[in-house]
Curated annotation (Swiss-Prot):
Source organism superkingdom: Eukaryota
Annotated transit peptide: 1-93
Gene3D superfamilies with a match to the protein in the record: photosynthetic oxygen evolving center domain (3.30.2050.10), Photosystem II, cytochrome c-550 precursor (2.40.160.30)
Leader peptide range in chain numbering: none
Protein name per Swiss-Prot or TrEMBL: Oxygen-evolving enhancer protein 1, chloroplastic
Natural source organism: Euglena gracilis
Biological processes per GO annotation: photosystem II assembly; photosystem II stabilization
UniProt function note: Stabilizes the manganese cluster which is the primary site of water splitting.
Places the protein is found: Plastid, Chloroplast thylakoid membrane
Gene Ontology MF term list: oxygen evolving activity
Sequence similarity: Belongs to the PsbO family.
A GO CC term attached to the entry: photosystem II oxygen evolving complex
Pfam families cross-referenced by the UniProt entry: MSP (PF01716)
Length: 338
């Protein structure tokens, strides 16, 4: 039986049309494979994000019902309203103690979500911190929000006002950190806290279900709180979201710019335009309540949950502010005053 030579002759030339046909089929197969791979990866990522969102929601609900049990068991809260991509970034961040956070390098923190988290207490107990009467300092005070809600005005169908969950629009830059305060403990065990300095405000924007976006300054600036070793509450100043030199689209500002809209100089004093023309940077007032859930008497570390209610941005006095309810976890270090 003779063998058949399947090799093409040396002088054989493959037609150009045949080459283009083979290349086209190969490119089509490659594109189909890439699309299928991307679809599969997208489905996997989507499922992972949804799973993390469900875990975050369940954790937040547990915090609301029993904060001490959650902090004692898990150490920190991952809120339901770390919305969208924020959920994935923060859910991957590990719960770390203060010393563990300080030992991390820049590259270890970069793009991990850890920079926006507060330390946790690994060896703390769920009890009050017993302090003698005297003056103390609060350092490295950290507030990490887990939920932002906006109070909606009453409607014809629903006369009772309630807070609506929102979607976070800004990046993971809403955590307040490195805050210092003075603590005065009275002879009866009462606490008086006066906030002094630190990263005590963060510009934040959330979005309602209907698409409306609500900007506000999450803050505890100039907080004056009173209570005891178990819980304390107080009021704080809410600075204007915009400064006096900010100019609106019409070029109007508080300390600079036009007095009225350029196209309506004669109507500048009309009531309809007065609120837009007269810019105000006056501060507002917010309230906040802290509950202690975990302490470490040896290190002076203390942690718990908080809930604050404050007004939103007023667009320099042109809009009626909305009430913002912020819930989350906090951490601080207490030491005798120097």
């Amino acid at each position: 039986m003779s063998r058949v030579n399947l090799a093409a002759p040396a002088n054989h030339v493959v037609p150009r049309a045949a080459q283009e046909e083979v290349q086209g089929e190969y490119q089509t197969a490659s594109n189909n494979w890439a699309v299928a791979a991307m679809a599969s990866a997208g489905a996997a990522v989507g499922a992972a994000v949804l799973a993390m969102r469900r875990r975050a929601t369940n954790t937040y609900e547990a915090i609301r019902e029993d904060p001490e049990a959650v902090l004692a068991g898990a150490g920190r809260a991952m809120g339901a309203a770390l919305i969208g991509a924020a959920v994935a970034g923060s859910a991957n961040a590990a719960s770390l103690t203060y010393d563990e956070l300080q030992s991390l390098s820049y590259l270890e923190v970069k793009s991990s979500g850890i920079a926006g988290t507060c330390p946790v207490l690994a060896d703390g107990v769920s009890s009050k911190l017993s302090l003698k009467a005297g003056k103390y300092e609060i350092n490295n005070w950290c507030l990490e929000p887990s939920s932002f809600q906006v109070k909606l005005p009453p409607t014809e169908k629903q006369q009772v006002t309630e807070f609506e969950r929102t979607k976070l629009m800004t990046r993971l830059t809403y955590t307040l950190d490195a805050i210092s305060a003075d603590l005065n403990v009275g002879g009866d065990g009462s606490w008086t806290i006066q906030e002094k300095d630190g990263l005590d405000y963060a510009a934040t924007t959330v979005q309602l279900a209907g698409g409306e976006r609500v900007p506000f300054l999450f803050t505890i600036k100039n907080l004056l709180a009173k209570g005891d070793a178990g819980q304390f509450l107080g009021q704080f100043d809410v600075p204007s979201y915009r400064g006096a030199t900010f100019l609106d689209p019409k070029g109007r500002g508080g300390a600079s710019g036009y007095d009225t809209a350029v196209a309506l100089p004669a109507s500048g004093d009309d009531e309809e335009y007065a609120k837009e023309n007269s810019k105000s940077t006056a501060a507002s007032v917010g309230t906040i309540a802290f509950k202690v859930a975990k302490v470490n008497a040896e290190t002076g570390e203390i942690a718990g949950v908080f809930e604050s209610i404050q007004p939103s941005d007023t667009d320099l006095g042109a809009k009626v502010p909305k009430d913002i309810k912020t819930s989350g976890v906090w951490y601080a270090q207490i030491s005798p005053s120097k």
